[in-house]
């Protein structure tokens, strides 16, 4: 009940990697983590899925992002954050958007970047399209959500960036965790 926020339907679901007799693979990447839980997605009726990272701390109203996603008629919305000028963005996915906020370039952990706008690892995706992209990716043995879905489909799908102004911090390293 707590994780569903007292709802009868929907809510928050956390998926942990599970090795079983039927499934001997640990998650091979971010797309595989979703693919291994695809039956859950197929049984749901909600039109949208919010995907979040487990190594970030942030304050964000998902309803505002969902409204933006619907307004843009987006296939995928990437929540982005402008980092301070001069801040090292080489450990993030870096995005460039056009004047309509459509993502025109996505570089994963670039050595030199043309932008200081980073992906926060938070996405809203149409559920049916997510299932379709995950199945295609798995059929081809591709397991990374950013490389094999976002970057691959950026010119074929309507992928928009939503710039968050609220607090966001990545805690993927011990140092960043203690900060």
Segments the model singles out, each with a brief description of its role:
Residues 42, 46, 50, 57, ...:
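Catalytic-core segments of class I nucleotidyltransferases/pyrophosphorylases
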Residues 34-37, 95, 130, 150:
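Structural element of the ATP-grasp superfamily
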Residues 60-90:
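Conserved donor-nucleotide/metal-binding helix-loop-beta segment in metal-dependent transferases, i.e.
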Residues 15-17, 79, 162-164:
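Conserved beta-strand termini and adjacent loop/short-helix elements that scaffold enzyme active sites
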Residues 36, 81-111:
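Rossmann-like NAD(P)H-binding beta-loop-alpha module
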Residues 78, 94, 122-124:
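Conserved hydrophobic/aromatic beta-strand scaffold that supports enzyme active sites
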Residues 1-68, 97:
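Conserved N-terminal catalytic core of the sugar/cofactor nucleotidyltransferase
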